[in-house]
Amino acid sequence: GCKKCGIPFEPTYLDSLIFAQNLLPELGKYKLDIVADHLQLPQFNHHRASDDAVPVAQMLAKFFVMLEERGVTRLQQINDEMTKLRPLGVKRNRFPKHIILIAKNKVGLKNLYQLISASNLKYFKRVPIIPKSELVAHREGLIIGSACEAGELFRAIVDHKDWNELKRIASFYDYLEIQPLGNNRFMVRDGTVRDDEDLKDFNRTVVKLGEELGKPVCATGDVHFLDPEDEVYRHILLASKKFADANEPVPLYFRTTDEMLKEFDYLGKEKAYEVVVTNTRAIAEQVEDIELLPKGKLFPPRLENSEEDLNRMVWGKAHELYGDDLPQLIVDRLNVELGSILGKYDVVYMSAQKLVQRSLECGYLVGSRGSVGSSLVAYMAGITEVNALPPHYRCPKCRNVEFHAGEYGCGADMPDKMCPVCGTKYAKDGFDIPFETFLGYGGGKVPDIDLNFSGEYQARAHAHAVEMFGKTQVFRAGTIGTLAEKTAYGFVKKYLEENGIAAGNAEIDRLTAGCVGVRRTTGQHPGGLVVVPDDMDIEDFCPVQHPADDPDSDTITTHFEYHCMEDNLLKLDMLGHDDPTMIRMLENLTGVNARAIPLDDPD
């Protein structure tokens, strides 16, 4: 009305529903009468606009008192306070819109990761949501596009917002998007618009906004699959999720440049080339070449004096077992290994050593899994019980040593023998495993120490890791669950059956193969922890989330599948197993120390 009369009308407005949701999170439902009863407001004649306005005003007065108690005394402070309260309350935006975020440099990449983390941890409601205030705070280094028909701008155009409002909305974005008519033809089918001409007018409106605001307009495909014939896989997957419109044709395939130019020829030849080629290239040229994760570069956390402690511990144990004058074979082996480890991977070794030692102190053996047994340093540090030296005799009293390389497969295969120096029975040891099995030739492979803890003790081991490195630096290793062949086969069979489609075995196998491997859910490694250096954030490497999108979970996992980061971050593989538990029980029952039992004991 004011607009028609030429009267400026730009009042400050407050949304009482948002106040109620964030200040009264315990309610759960926020109908006017429910909130009024909770606030003990006088009875009113509900559903009459004039009567409803009175309790809303009374609510606002009470909400202002609540805000004053939180230190909010100015209108300008309210939005920030609502953002702080939202994670504690309903954590949702009632009508979230789609948006495109492109990281153009490393700063933008970290901001993108931080937004993804926040959307999953703080604002998740059925889907991850990013409040606009968070987006503005993390905008540096990002290119923001207006997205598809579910974007804020396109929805405003469909809703026939006035021109000034459209300009206000469009001005927020770095570039505006238009898409092929087929992407939005569902609007014709559901009666939102009359025909394709209305869809063309929507795109023309976006182009006009771009021209008036000086914003580039880019033609995009909203691509969901590669080739047109791949659309059937999307139908099958949507049908498995019970979507009512699973079979509606939506040609979201990767179009060629010529196909895109033809799609937008109604804009004129020059304008079509501008939106399809010129502007999209201009956006792409703003994006730097970004290395997501530096290949082969480990960013280990810090443990105080880890290098000195490991070096001292290893040589001390070597002298304790093999004498003051160490055999040259042992000296050479330790020098080679320590040369590859110290200054690079010493934290990996010392963190494992501390975890194993704590478990042993609590009475639980730890099984070392994988190739760590090929490291003599790991043996000397007490991480593994596997001695990688060639088969040999070692006197536990006078420390005399006899090597028998090549004669036996391992020390346990050698016959018993007495020490010729002091007459004590020799200990038999050595499994003859080259160090390269663990760190590769030249020591260039990032070490991966896998440990099997007692299932009873595993949670305490994880807590010890958090204690060592800090709660904000330790995360569960994330996993991605994909569609298995048997499940995909079931989806295909049900889809064909429900749609009355006859197909031979070859066609069923083809459709199944097209669905296999599609991401289905996220999870967590049963024992994997990822540790970030204390001078860095997890978002320097990847975002984080709750497993399986469960907002009620206390666990925070890496958003990326952990294997892609194992060369960059320390991963503690700490599985829970029954064997250490059973060994402890047997020790308690028999009084026999399991570590004292010879490997060649016939009993």
Regions from the language model: what does each represent?
Residues 1-12, 155, 164-166, 170, ...:
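Substrate-recognition/cap helix-loop segment adjacent to the acidic, metal-dependent catalytic center
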Residues 324-367:
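Helix-rich "cap/lid" substructures immediately adjacent to catalytic or cofactor-binding pockets
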Residues 1, 358-360, 371-383:
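Catalytic DNA-binding helix-loop module of base-excision-repair DNA glycosylases/AP lyases
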Residues 1-2, 25-82:
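Acidic, Mg2+-coordinating catalytic module of metal-dependent nucleases/exonucleases
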Residues 8-21, 77, 101, 144:
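Conserved beta-strand -> loop -> alpha-helix junction used to position metal-binding or nucleic-acid-contacting
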Residues 65-314, 355-356, 365, 383-603:
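Mg2+-dependent phosphoryl-transfer active-site scaffold
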